[in-house]
Amino acid sequence: MVQLTEETYLYDPNLLLKLDFHRSPANFKPFISAANPGEPWMKVRPLKDTDYDRGFLQLLSQLTHVGNVNRTQFLTRFSQMKASGDYFVTVIEDTRKNEIIGAASLVIERKFIHNCAVRGRLEDVVVNDTYRGKQLGKLIVVTVSLLAEELGCYKMSLDCKDKLIKFYESLGYVAIPGNSNSMTIRYDEGPTLKRNATSAGSSGTVGDSCQTVSLDFAS
């Protein structure tokens, strides 16, 4: 394994410390949050440029086809996402194994409507098969949903399978009438991203969207 001496976050990890999990309708038993994920060896954080070596792409392959992405391609896409400021890929790490075990992406869409508001999309949600039952599905979705609110999104949208509608309803999402399996959660409208989300070198960023949400667990 290549030894990496310097690591870069996709966005400012301090944003996650601001999230108030008591604002979510999710029912955690026991209560957990991004700051306290339930186990001392778990850490919720932004994606790092070194996560290529922590199995991030292998985890995504449990969700959908990833392809043969080499290190250079990974780092190039990471840099593009960071530079754009509109991608907030968030992961859960098992620090005992130095392995990524959960992930979800918030993609920011900039609008002219609603006074040039910003909207969030929840995408690429996945939890390692062997870690089911630890509420990690709820944890990663609620983390990214609260992050969207923190960043000033007026709403967050997702697409899901039939069997996951109840799961997302339990987290505050509602089905969009006449729009198949699209769901949304609305926040107080905010016209722009908060300044701390786009501050120097610590923000996430824009690019093309990937696969939408597809979870295969019920917790």
Swiss-Prot record:
Keywords: Acyltransferase, Transferase. GO terms for cellular component: cytoplasm. Substrate binds at residues 64, 111-114, 123-125, 154-155, 186. One of its GO terms (biological process) is UDP-N-acetylglucosamine biosynthetic process. One of its GO terms (molecular function) is glucosamine 6-phosphate N-acetyltransferase activity. Residues 42-198 form the N-acetyltransferase domain. Signal peptide: none annotated. Pathway: Nucleotide-sugar biosynthesis; UDP-N-acetyl-alpha-D-glucosamine biosynthesis; N-acetyl-alpha-D-glucosamine 1-phosphate from alpha-D-glucosamine 6-phosphate (route I): step 1/2. It holds the Pfam family Acetyltransf_1. It catalyses: D-glucosamine 6-phosphate + acetyl-CoA = N-acetyl-D-glucosamine 6-phosphate + CoA + H(+). Acetyl-CoA binds at residues 133-138. PANTHER family: GLUCOSAMINE 6-PHOSPHATE N-ACETYLTRANSFERASE. Belongs to the acetyltransferase family. GNA1 subfamily. This is Probable glucosamine 6-phosphate N-acetyltransferase.
